């Protein structure tokens, strides 16, 4: 049974489309990964789900409730942790959690018990009674997660919860999310970290340019690709012209299914091949054209390969493309709507 149903969502900011016919179903009790580059529409989707933003069209159903018609009812079962941490720098972490508990009308004894439990689970004992203005980014993120969990939500929505964090804070958050998943909490986790979604998610969707382009378990998506992945270089850094020349040479090699130029990695070539037996053919074709292999690495399919198969570019290439198009002022205006 699906706890979340997003049907044909459309959303634009002025003339710029953010979501285009986005449809998604998240099973109850599942840790569901939402993977895509910055600017793909992840935050817009989560803000609509959290009843903080209205779509131009489409339906949002949470636990059988129409979130657009009854947002108050949905908010009672939902915990939302936004990408941008917003905390009062004057309060201590404990005081902020107490305030959050009061806003949820939790009885004082229950509120304090939950606060103590979250302090323990998120390893905040050493600094929880210091003012929030003294906290590091990892401390603030853990506190923000604790605030989102204080009312024991049935559904937890997380927007890039570990972006920019130190390894210790990331490990703590991963452990908590795995425990919540085991206890039956439904979690929608937005991320552009491939390894995070691969490690944590039971099911996932990949989003690009406001559309869901792939959906399933991480293993299903990787296995569906078939073949081995080969990363090839003829020198440490090639240019676009040389990379295209090599691609054209290798396209005709028997057993080579697909070749994509990875601009973000010095114009290396990402190949999909039928197996080990194809590698000598690749090396021979290069040698016949007076080209030597600088480096060659073979691996099984990854989530980046899934993204590459669906879009023709790697996730890092997509990140770089978005970074070059960004308008910080426009992004701030959009986030305030």
Residue map of PLM features:
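ABC transporter nucleotide-binding domains
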Residues: 2-214
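Solvent-exposed beta-strand sheet faces enriched in polar/charged residues
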Residues: 7, 233, 262, 297-299
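Short phosphate-engaging motifs
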Residues: 18, 196, 239-242, 278, ...
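Short, surface-exposed acidic/glycine-rich loop or hinge patches that mediate macromolecular interfaces
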Residues: 65-68, 212, 237, 276, ...
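A generic structural signal for secondary-structure junctions
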Residues: 79, 105, 144, 226, ...
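ABC transporter nucleotide-binding domain
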Residues: 175-273
